[in-house]
Amino acid sequence: MGDIRPQKFRHRIDTPPLRGVNIQRLFGSQRALKTVEDFTEFEQRAAYFDGDPVIATKKGVNILERGSQVHFMAEVQEEIMDFPPAPKLNIYGKLDPKKATEAELRGQEIFFGKAQCAACHMPSYYIDNLMHNLKTERFFKPQMVNGRMASADGPIKTFPLRGIKDSPPYLHDGRLLTLEDTVEFFNLVQDLKLNPQEKSDLVAYMRAL
C-alpha cells in the first residue's frame, strides 16, 4: 500500500545515493521497508501514484517475480554499487595517521568525542541502521511552505557517512546543502558549542571518509 496521506502532510525525502545500499536496512519515506528487495517490490506495486487509485489503475501493475527479477536487481545494487575508495582509512574505518592531515586527525577526535557523532555513525561504514529523534520541534512551529506542511519529522534514519562528500545535499530531506551546513545544524540541535576551528576540522574529517 502506498502513502495515502494528503500531499501536504507527506514526508519529503532526499533521493539517496545507491552506493553502499548493501549495508542499509531501512527504506521508503516512512522507513517501513527493511530490505532493498522489499523496497523494489513496493516501488513497482504502489509508488508514484500520489495516493490516487485512478492514477494507479492507468499505470497498471508490473509485478516483479521475487525469486528472480527482484533478486537480480538487488544483486546489482548490493554487489556493484559499493562506496567510493577512501585511501586514508585503515581496515577499521579510522584514519591512518601516516596519510591523514592534522586537520583531519583533529576532526576525527572531535567526531568521536565532543561532537558525539559516533553515537549514531559508527565505523567502519558510519551507520547504525536505526532511527533517531532529534526533537527539532524545539526550534520551529509547523507552517505551510510551498504547499507543504513543514514540521518536525520525528525519528529520522541514520545514513552512512562513507563517501559523504560526494552525495549532497544532506539530512533526510536534503535541507542542508553542504557539509558545513550539516555540521552547523547538529551543532545547534545538540548544543555542542563547537568553535569555528572545530567545525572546520570536523568537515575535513568527513571529507576523508
Regions found by a protein language model. Name each.
Residues M1-L209:
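Periplasmic c-type cytochrome electron-transfer domains
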